[in-house]
Amino acid sequence: MESIYKYGWIIPLLPLVSSITIGLGLFFFPKATKSLRRTYAIISTLLLSIAMFISFDLLWQQIAGSPTYRYLWSWIPDQDVTLEVGYPIDPLTSIMLVLVTTIGVTVMIHSDSYMSHDQGYVRFFAYLSLSTASMLGLVISPNLIQIYIFRELVGMCSYLLIGFWFTRPSAANACQKAFITNRVGDFGLLLGTSGFYWITGSFKFEDLFERFNESLANHEVSLFLATPCALLFPLGPVAKSAQFPLHVWLPDAMEGPTPISAPIHAATMVAAGIFLVARMFPLFQTLPLVMSSISWVGGVTASLGATVALAQKDLKRVLAYSTMSQLGYMMLALGIGSYRAASFHLITHAYPKALSSPGSGSVIHSMEPIVGYCPDKSQNIALMGGLRKYVPITGTTFLLGTLSLCGIPPLACFWSKDEIIADSWLYFPILGWIARFTAGLTGFYTFRMYSLTLEGDFRANPSKNLISSYVSPWENSRFGTSSQKQTDSALPLAQNRIESFDPSENIQEFSDKNVKNSVSTQSSREEYSPHPKESDNTMLFPLLILTIPTLLVGFIGVPSYQEEMGPDLLSHWLDPSLSLSNQINYENWLLEFIANATVSVGTASLGIFTASILYGPIPFFPRDLRQKTDLQLEGILGHFSSLLYNWSYSRGYIDGYYNIVFIKGTRILAKIISFFDQWIIDGIVNGVGISGSFGGEGSRYGEGGRISYYLFGFISGTIILLLVVINYKHDFFP
C-alpha cells in the first residue's frame, strides 16, 4: 500500500513534463514541433492517462480503508519558520485526483478532433497539460502556502486558455476580466492566510485547525479578530468558484475554445474554490457568522445563476450560468454544515457538466459548416433546433446530461441535489425555499436549452432567400405567422426573427490567423451540406465514456439495503466521524427519502414541463388558442415578461453596474488624482522652482558690476526708508 503512495508526486509531474516539453519544442524548434503535433497530443494524453490509473489505484486504497498518508519534506528550514512541502493522500484528495484526471483525459481526446483545424493546436495541448498539472498540484497540497502557489498557476492557465484566441478582442478582454476579478479574491485569500498564520503560527492544515480551535476554546484569540480573517479567506473561493458578487468573469470565459469548458466548469478552476472551502471546513464550522455568510452567498449565487440563464441565447453561456448555479448549491451546503452533501454534489455535478460541455462542442462543431465559424452564429441556440435527428449520439448524451443537471432520478445530480435541498430546509426554511425555487428554474432553463437546440425544426435555413423562423414559447417555429409581433419584449427567446443566409458566404467568416484556411471557399461550397452532420468518433468517444459515471456515480451516496442500515459508502469513506452514529431503520429512511425526493423532483419536473410547453416541439394547444393566448399575454403579462426578459438577458445589469461603479468610477478618480497631482502637487513644486529662477535672474541683473546701478539702488533705498520712517514716526518715536 505504502509503495504506491510514495509515487503520488508523479501524478502532477506527468502532465507538467508534457507541458514543458511542448513549450520548449515550440520555443526552440517551432517547425519540427508543429509537424509532430499529433505525436505531442498522443504523448500528452498518454501521460495523463498514466496519472489517471495511479489516481484510481490511490482511490481504491482509500476505499479499502487505508489510513491517510502524508509525505512531507522541509523546503525552508528555520528556527522560527519551517515551511514544508509534500502531498497528503486522503479521501477528499483521492476523489479530486480521479475527477481531474478522468475529465482531463476525455477532454484531451475530444480536443484532438475539435482543435485539429487550429494553428494553435500544439499550444493548446501545452496550456491544457499545464492547467491539469496545476490543478493536481493544488489538490495534493498539504498547507496554505503550497495551495496558494498552485492556485495562482491555475489562474494563469485559465488566463491563457480563455485568451487562447488572443487576436479576437472579446477573448483578450475576457481573459483580462477573469484575471483581474480573481486577483480581488486572491487578495482576500492572502490577507486571510496571513491572519491565520499570525493566530496559529502554522500553514499546515492539521496544525492550523488544532491550534485555532484551542485558541478559541482557551480564549487566547478574540472572535473579533478571528472572524474578519475567516471572512476574508473565502473571498478567494468566491472569486475562483464564480460566486456572487465575483461571478462576472465566468460567462465571458466561454470566449476560449469549447473543449476547455469541461475542465473549467467541472474539474479545474471553479472546483478549486469549493475544494479550498471544503479543506478549511473544520475551521469555518467553529465560526457561526462565517458559516452563515457562506450559506447566503451560495444561496444567492444559485438563484441568480439560474435566473440569468433563463434568457441567454449563447449555448455556452447557458452552461456557464448553470455551473455558477450548481456551485452555489455546493457553497450553500458547506455553509449550512453539510460537508458530505457538498462533497457529494462536487462529484455528481462534475461528470454531467463534463458531458454537457463537450456535447455543446459537438453541437457547435456540427453547426459551423452551416452558419460559419463566427461564435455569434454557431453558438446561438436560436439558429439551431431539430439537431437530434442529424446528430443522434450527441443528442442522446446531451439529453442525459441535461436530465442529470435537472435532478431527475436515478441520474447523478438527483441524489446530491435532493440532499442539499433537504438539509437547507432543516437548517433555515428561507434557504430551503431558495434551493427549491432554483431547482425549478434549473429544470426550466436546461430544457429550454435542450428544446431550442435539439428538438423542433432546424431554423438556420440554408436558402439564399430570406426566410424568417419564428421562435415563440406558445408557437412552434413551424407555425410562425406574419401577424405575430416580432419584438424582444416577451419571455426568453419568445419572439425573435432569425433570418437565413447563404452559408457559403459565411464559411470563411471566422477565418482569422488562428484558423487554418487549408480549404478554399470553392471547395467549401462543393462539400457543403444543408444539414448538420454528426461529429467523428474521436469527439463522440469521450461523450459515451462520460455517460457511465453520469448514470452510476450517484449511487455511492445511497445506503446499502439492509434491515438495519449503516452509513453509506460516501459517508464512511469521507470521514468516519461524519458517518451515522447509530443504525437507522431502512423503512424510516426510505419514507423520508421519498418525501424529500417527491418535492425536489416535482419542482424540477414542473420547470421541465413549463419549458416543454413553451419551447417543445409538440404543440400543447390548438393553433388558434395559442394565438389568442399570445394576445392576452401581451396585455396581461407583457410588461412583466419584458422586464424579466431584459433583466435576465442583460445578466441582471450587474456587469453594467460594475462598469459604472468600478471601471468608470476608477477612471474618474484617476482623472481627479491626475488633475490634483498636475496642478496642485506639481504646481507647488514647480512654483517654488520658478520663483527661485526669477529671483536668481533678478539678482543677476542687479549685480551687473556697474557703479551707477549700485548708486541708484542705494539712493532709492534710502529715500524709501526715510519715507517709511516719516510716515510712521509716531509709532517708532512715541
Swiss-Prot record:
It catalyses: a plastoquinone + NADH + (n+1) H(+)(in) = a plastoquinol + NAD(+) + n H(+)(out); a plastoquinone + NADPH + (n+1) H(+)(in) = a plastoquinol + NADP(+) + n H(+)(out). It is a multi-pass membrane protein. Pfam families: Proton_antipo_C (PF01010), Proton_antipo_M (PF00361), Proton_antipo_N (PF00662). Keywords: Chloroplast, Membrane, NAD, NADP, Plastid, Plastoquinone, Quinone, Thylakoid, Translocase, Transmembrane, Transmembrane helix, Transport. Residues 512-534 are annotated as: Disordered. GO terms for molecular function: NADH dehydrogenase (ubiquinone) activity; quinone binding. Its EC number is 7.1.1.-. It comes from the Eukaryota. Its main location: plastid. It is found in: Plastid, Chloroplast thylakoid membrane. The chain crosses the membrane at residues 9-29, 40-60, 89-109, 121-140, 144-166, 185-205, 219-239, 258-278, 289-311, 318-338, 395-415, 425-445, 539-559, 601-621, 707-727. One of its GO terms (cellular component) is chloroplast thylakoid membrane. The keyword tRNA processing does not apply. One of its GO terms (biological process) is electron transport coupled proton transport. Residues 524-534 have a biased composition (Basic and acidic residues). NDH is composed of at least 16 different subunits, 5 of which are encoded in the nucleus. Belongs to the complex I subunit 5 family. NDH shuttles electrons from NAD(P)H:plastoquinone, via FMN and iron-sulfur (Fe-S) centers, to quinones in the photosynthetic chain and possibly in a chloroplast respiratory chain. The immediate electron acceptor for the enzyme in this species is believed to be plastoquinone. Couples the redox reaction to proton translocation, and thus conserves the redox energy in a proton gradient. This is NAD(P)H-quinone oxidoreductase subunit 5, chloroplastic. It comes from Huperzia lucidula (Shining clubmoss). The lineage of its organism: Eukaryota, Viridiplantae, Streptophyta, Embryophyta, Tracheophyta. The gene is ndhF.
